[in-house]
């Protein structure tokens, strides 16, 4: 067998919050894949890091009264502790706020710039005339244009929940100097993504780099036309300064999404430095140099919401800077709990630490494995099904094989297994199934692998039920048959431990001690345990109790009063507004009514603006890339260009009408409508939602 050299990454968790079960889908999926490939004899390295840059980090640190550096250090320690609880076995865990990441970010930028792939243009923003700097929304305060509450931030009102643009604030002032800000233009740096369109079309369709559904979605983006990507941000900003900018101009910083994927390289370089001079030494260029692209493999596991960055920007950046591109990018769906999006009020927004206080992490690892496939599909953590499946499959089927057999062997035969297998055809069948299981693991068809493993467990239990060793033990002269039956059962149990080791590393480590063996690699399944002595059996796994799940849910519940949630007085205000004379047509007016059935046909969802760009050749359009909670983002055109710069809308949550028929336009296909209010002639305002709005939720 040829030993493959593989580098694997998971997307970097953001360093301003806790790890929750939704995050863990990806890290558990990646860890299982890495462990399975290592078990099959390949050389696999798994690296990750905290994504530690951006305005949000800076503001979080300010709220906590610490420096950004201390903030990200505290969060990284918490993240690593959570990952360890769930047995995520990184070879290295680093931070994007590192010298390695700075060096690689600057290297890539300079190579792109020198090759002519970087350009500049002016963007209009609020500016502090005293501090002489551009202001992010959270550095502007003023009077809310809706409810007149004072001292509200430049993106939303914490009193009435209204969201708005910073330029709409009344009596605005800079939180840094108290000065009244002015509108001013700023030079921003752009990466010329359209130059790489043909390369990306070829790359996304070659060598099975992407899942088919992802490649198809990318084709829609190609049809709509790629646009240049703003890679710069103005100070104040926590991140890396863009090098070599004119000395007479304000400092510019790399946008967090430029240096975040570079963090994969930085973490790997950090590991290379740690292992230098050891038997496990790694050569950075062996994995990342362009000429070695077909010698080694690089895989990124990501969520479906960041495909745009990993399948377009990232490979284009790498190709433009003469570095190797990923062998594959694997996207997964989101996590639902009890068929709905995670909810703090229902107690289903469950943090990793809260789960681990109540339940064993391997329960979740197995349940996720039983649900995950190679498709970009959401998975559902049904808590009742979770309890039943773990109790039935792991405790009732797998562990039960050992507990039913080991006692007879230890008590009557000093733990010795027979020298000859009494059921070679049965054991050969289960051994050969290992080939299918190994292939399912490699292809990320974990649910298929779990089904195959449980079929093997069923065969073992059927065999034990048929032979009834507990009854044979009472029959004089049947001692050899009892030993034969129990030895076959223990051998099958051993095979199941080989197959489950990538999913249940702690259970299988304990099983190795019981089985008195050192190796659970896939190759070891071909060597049956004959004339072998096992140790006394100890319980390997406990059943999940309903009370433990209930306690976890209760601990996860948050207060129903959240920032931006309507209060009674706000509801009264809304009701008053809707029943005012201006809002109610008189009995003599002939209003054009529609029935509730007609209105119900309109599907409106919360959408996150992944990207917003100008449309070359269209003076009225902006192009949105929207995450509406589906398998792939949507492309939507909106005629609001003269009222907004793209940067004002990127990252916002907006309302998208999602069941409009796709409209073919000169510049591509529009797959929905972004809702705005106002007069198209005098001014349109995009309706934005609070951060608490859940992507993909329907408006009611």
From Swiss-Prot:
One matching Pfam family is tRNA-synt_1g
What functional role does this protein have? Is required not only for elongation of protein synthesis but also for the initiation of all mRNA translation through initiator tRNA(fMet) aminoacylation.
Q: Name one GO cellular component term.
A: cytosol
What organism is recorded for this protein?
Answer: Psychrobacter cryohalolentis (strain ATCC BAA-1226 / DSM 17306 / VKM B-2378 / K5)
Q: What is the lineage of its organism?
A: Bacteria, Pseudomonadati, Pseudomonadota, Gammaproteobacteria, Moraxellales
User: What is this protein identified as?
Assistant: Methionine--tRNA ligase
Which cofactor does this sequence's record say it needs? Zn(2+)
Report keywords, A-Z.
Answer: Aminoacyl-tRNA synthetase, ATP-binding, Cytoplasm, Ligase, Metal-binding, Nucleotide-binding, Protein biosynthesis, RNA-binding, tRNA-binding, Zinc
* Gene, per the UniProt record: metG
The UniProt record lists the EC number as 6.1.1.10
Record's cofactor remark:
Binds 1 zinc ion per subunit.
- Show where the tRNA-binding domain sits: 598-700
The sequence motif named 'HIGH' region is recorded at 13-23
User: PROSITE patterns recorded for this chain?
Assistant: AA_TRNA_LIGASE_I, TRBD
**Subunit comment:** Homodimer.
In chain numbering, where does the motif 'KMSKS' region fall? 341-345
Q: Where in the cell is it found?
A: Cytoplasm
Reaction(s) catalysed by this chain, per the record, are: tRNA(Met) + L-methionine + ATP = L-methionyl-tRNA(Met) + AMP + diphosphate
**Leading EC class:** ligase
Polar residues compositional bias: what residue ranges?
577-587
UniProt-listed Gene3D superfamilies: HUPs, Isoleucyl-tRNA Synthetase, Domain 1, Methionyl-tRNA synthetase, Zn-domain, Nucleic acid-binding proteins
Recorded GO molecular functions are: ATP binding; metal ion binding; methionine-tRNA ligase activity; tRNA binding
Per UniProt, ATP binds at 344
Spans annotated as Disordered:
562-587
The family assignment reads: Belongs to the class-I aminoacyl-tRNA synthetase family. MetG type 1 subfamily.
An individual GO BP term: methionyl-tRNA aminoacylation
The cross-references to InterPro entries, in alphabetical order and at most eight, read:
aa-tRNA-synth_I_CS, Anticodon_Met, M/V/L/I-tRNA-synth_anticd-bd, Met-tRNA-synth_bsu_C, Met-tRNA_ligase_1, Met-tRNA_synth, Methionyl/Leucyl_tRNA_Synth, MetRS_core
Which residues does Zn(2+) bind?
144, 147, 157, 160
Q: Where does the protein principally reside?
A: cytoplasm
